[in-house]
A protein has these predicted regions:
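Nucleotide and nucleotide-moiety/phosphate-recognizing core
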Residues: 1-104, 112-129, 135-136, 140-146
Length: 148
């Protein structure tokens, strides 16, 4: 089990329903906001296995977003859309829940169906979207950090 640092500024919650994948996690966050009477209009999602994604990329992403132009924004680099690096309007909650009930599980397919805007980010090495999925990836990340 993972031991999390306790903080009054961080809330942890279990997915409201298991087996729904990343979209279920997004919906869980939206439901938590509603249930806890938060006045948030947006949530951000970022994978936790991308050690080279920095505040610089995050700041650029937020600066380029025009929230009156959409309800869902993802980051794009080169020709790749990064479907977990996102900003999601809480207004998508009912549609997301309906589509999950109908069996949709793929973030890319769902985002395409409702309409998604992208913000292109150019970057220098190391690749901020490099993610660690295997022991080999971890070794590579350690080497990148040593050489950076």
């Amino acid at each position: 089990p993972i031991n999390f640092i306790q903080s009054k500024n961080i809330s942890f919650t279990n997915d409201f329903k298991n087996g729904l994948g990343p979209l279920g996690g997004v919906l869980t966050a939206m439901k938590w906001i509603k249930q806890n009477n938060r006045n948030y209009e947006w949530i951000s999602t970022f994978p936790s296995d991308t050690p080279f994604f920095t505040k610089k990329e995050l700041k650029y992403f937020y600066e380029k977003i025009r929230i009156n132009e959409g309800k869902l924004f993802f980051i794009k680099s080169e020709d790749t859309r990064h479907n977990i690096f996102g900003l999601w309007s809480i207004k998508l909650m009912d549609q997301l829940e309906t589509d999950l009930e109908k069996g949709e599980r793929k973030v890319e397919v769902w985002a395409d169906s409702i309409g998604v805007n992208t913000v292109n980010i150019d970057y220098k090495k190391p690749d901020p979207f490099f993610n660690i999925n295997t022991k080999e990836d971890l070794k590579k990340a350690i080497e990148i950090m040593k050489n950076d």
